[in-house]
Amino acid sequence: MAQNLLECYKNKLAVSEGYYSKTHNGEKLSMNKKMVVARLLENTNKYMTEAFNNSVGTQRSDMGSYKRFALNLVTVAVPSLIAFDLVMVQPMSSMSGYVNYIEYVAGTNKGATAQGDVFNSPFALGDFDKDGNVKTTDADYTAARVVEVLTDDLTLSWTPVARIVKVDNVALTKEQAANITVDENGKITDGNDTQIIKAGAKVAYIYDNVVIPQNDLPILNAKMSMIPVVAKARRIAIYYSQIAAFQAKNDYGFDLGDQLAEQAVGRLAYEIDTEIVDTLVTNAAEDSELVWSKSLPHGVSKQEHYAGFVEVLEMAAAKLYQRTKKFAPNYLLIAADIKPILAFVPGFQAATVNNMNGPYMAGTLNGLKVYVSPNMEAKTFVLGVNGNDMMTSAAAYCPYMPVVPTQLLGYADGAMSQGFSTMYDIVVLNKALLIAGRVTA
């Protein structure tokens, strides 16, 4: 099926690759990206075919050119988006759905591990806390060692108890241990004069996990989780006068309808790219250590000082790797006022910018693709990971209906009108793959 789609739309994909290269510093479309464009072309083709088959309009002779126009829009508009470099792109087959994935969770309360704690998921080994850091689970979940906080009834959960090792991280002496007994139900009796065992104490102990029958076992459960995806619409219409179009063509040599259509599609593309960038920036937790001062120290040239900006980026990359244990960032989002700093940074290679429509690719820095967004807060930057799959993408752009036009309608008074619509959703997959910093004046 995949090869059939690529073969069917190979000519349009060649055009798509040309537009992609113009907006992505000469890069070529990967096989995965070609499949995305081909799938959107196929969805649009099916929609147009069904619409024409059900049509009872009087302008059926124009439908062939209209269909080509619609497919050409997809061919050009989709590859021009920066979405491919920043997030996973996954076309939707219906207007609403779910991104399903499996988490492997604890099925038993044992020590520091609570029932439902995540051991493994597509996103990381473990779960994330509010700051986006991976929470470590009990390394002794399957072992005989248990550390738990005592409740008021002074009863240990895992039995039979062989011996108590520590209380509140303090090892027991032989005399103290000899005066403490634990019955078969885990009830503790403390015969020490100082009453070491109290409610709320953290007790480390060893239980017999070999004898049978076992009262309880550490359990691993598979949990099906899902992220809802619901396509939302963006729509825009063009409206102009037949007389104005005639004058534009006759006096100035350009097609007003084509110009307005190009501007309408460009506006949709700008808003999609901006929404993607805003989503990433909003979900990137700012790290207080990732702050770099632009102010020049005494006796240091601007060239030397600005080159030091790389250090804070490397710190951010290290934090991101340490957080996830397996991912390093591959793109950098910056506010417009940070770009002049990069001109002094060794390793920055500026990209040739042919067409600029909102957020754009400014170049590369030590393997990071650098994107500038006019909507980002001044002096802020974000590093992120995108590998075009669920495990390695912070978010997903899910187009349901690519940019699809209506037919151009002409009215008796000479008014001309045409509409353009798109439907998609943007969902956050993994906030831990984003980290933000700041530049001070």
How would you name each of these model-derived features?
Residues M1-L150, T155-S157:
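Extended assembly-interface regions of large multimeric machines
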Residues M63-K67, M95-Y101, R235-A237, A328-L332, ...:
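Beta-sheet entry/capping signal
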Residues V74-L81, S94-V134, D138, T142, ...:
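Acidic/polar, low-complexity extended loops/arms that serve as protein-protein interfaces
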